[in-house]
Amino acid sequence: MSSGKIVQVIGPVVDVEFSLDQSLPDINNALVVYKNGEAKQKVVLEVALELGDGVIRSIAMESTDGLQRGMEVIDTGKSISVPVGKDTLGRVFNVLGDTIDLEAPFPADAERSGIHKKAPAFDELSTSNEILETGIKVIDLLAPYLKGGKVGLFGGAGVGKTVLIQELIHNIAQEHGGISVFTGVGERTREGNDLYYEMKDSGVIEKTAMVFGQMNEPPGARMRVALTGLTIAEYFRDVEGQDVLLFIDNIFRFTQAGSEVSALLGRMPSAVGYQPTLATEMGQLQERITSTKKGSITSIQAIYVPADDYTDPAPATAFAHLDATTNLERKLTEQGIYPAVDPLASSSSALAPEIVGEEHYEVATEVQHILQRYRELQDIIAILGMDELSDDEKVLVGRARRVQFFLSQNFNVAEQFTGQPGSYVPVAETVRGFKEILEGKHDNLPEEAFRSVGKIEDAIEKAKQLNY
């Protein structure tokens, strides 16, 4: 193993000089610096650039506090490697694969795998037309998720992306019992902490591995932590032959960290200040998140939309890789409709009669049609009032409002805030409920009875409680 010396430290960027008679470390190799010569006080760097004359530029995965010029740097000869396998379930890791959950130390002889890999070859890929039931009505009806597919949850600040991800983890773990990998990329540490203890209390943690590189960490860690989580998921897919769920919260922070690293490396910025390699970095991550003949990875990714601008390069680049998009809309949160999923903007390649069935497809398209017509009539209602509408239009508006409210429901993970028990609604019940509303079977019930309920029977029961 070759060794060099630190010649410059600029925040998270460390320049290291190797003597010319040694071979330079490869790009993406992990380098280690021992502060005060102690193994416990090590800092891991990743090679990013070769500057010439035996000098390389690296990005630190941890704080560079305490590093000085002249300190020895050792080339490990390989990329950052993290623990994989069944022992990772129930544990919490950082970007380097070190446990951070205060439980018993992780076995030193555990199998490890490098975080930099090639995407599966074209002939290894597999596709599936099987629907993944989430128990969330608006998703299952209008933008269903495919097993082994890629889903993006798009939304601005505070519209409910993380809560929706937490509910999906809860529902899929409770109902399907599959293995999950949760990757927190540049999000709030408090949310990660809450999620860990909630999963521990519900027993879901036993089938989940968690990886965090949160807001307070250097950009190198935030950029690479998504690869750490993906590496753990890939092992379950390729070696164990499992169907894995990979949750990433938040893909935008991955892009943001890449932008910071790019600026630190002195690259010329591209549109809106993003890194020129944005599409390449996103492609390298997303192409590895796929299903093969051995197993599948179904990924659900929260994607923050800066200033609610969907044309921003970060969310726009992610769009191209997704099978389904769930768009969260701020106007719906203002109306108290949760989850605030926009039923007209959300889409899925799985909403086709040959995949979901004729009845489901017809009900979904009719729901979209009635909501679109209601949206067109809203201007007339706002200016002239309901009295100017024809009788047919009044009936349509009434049903559309019932449909809009029925698309909302209480979440299990939000019970501590709302005081209302959450509901899991099977797809068949969802389709039946909306079909009955569209047929006018519940035109006599007040609109408010449909807000935040589960099955259609819950709406009928709520109407009785409203003394209707």
Curated annotation (Swiss-Prot):
Keywords from the UniProt entry: ATP synthesis, ATP-binding, Cell membrane, CF(1), Hydrogen ion transport, Ion transport, Membrane, Nucleotide-binding, Translocase, Transport
Catalytic activity, reaction form: ATP + H2O + 4 H(+)(in) = ADP + phosphate + 5 H(+)(out)
InterPro entries documented for this protein: AAA+_ATPase, ATP-synt_VA_C, ATP_synth_F1_bsu, ATPase_a/bsu_AS, ATPase_alpha/beta_chains, ATPase_F1/V1/A1_a/bsu_N, ATPase_F1/V1/A1_a/bsu_N_sf, ATPase_F1/V1/A1_a/bsu_nucl-bd
GO molecular function: ATP binding; ATP hydrolysis activity; proton-transporting ATP synthase activity, rotational mechanism
Superkingdom of origin organism: Bacteria
Cellular compartments annotated: Cell membrane
HAMAP family in UniProt: ATP_synth_beta_bact
Record PANTHER family: ATP SYNTHASE, ATP SYNTHASE SUBUNIT BETA, MITOCHONDRIAL
Self-association and partners: F-type ATPases have 2 components, CF(1) - the catalytic core - and CF(0) - the membrane proton channel. CF(1) has five subunits: alpha(3), beta(3), gamma(1), delta(1), epsilon(1). CF(0) has three main subunits: a(1), b(2) and c(9-12). The alpha and beta chains form an alternating ring which encloses part of the gamma chain. CF(1) is attached to CF(0) by a central stalk formed by the gamma and epsilon chains, while a peripheral stalk is formed by the delta and b chains.
Function: Produces ATP from ADP in the presence of a proton gradient across the membrane. The catalytic sites are hosted primarily by the beta subunits.
NCBIfam families registered for this protein in UniProt: atpD
Name of the protein this chain belongs to: ATP synthase subunit beta
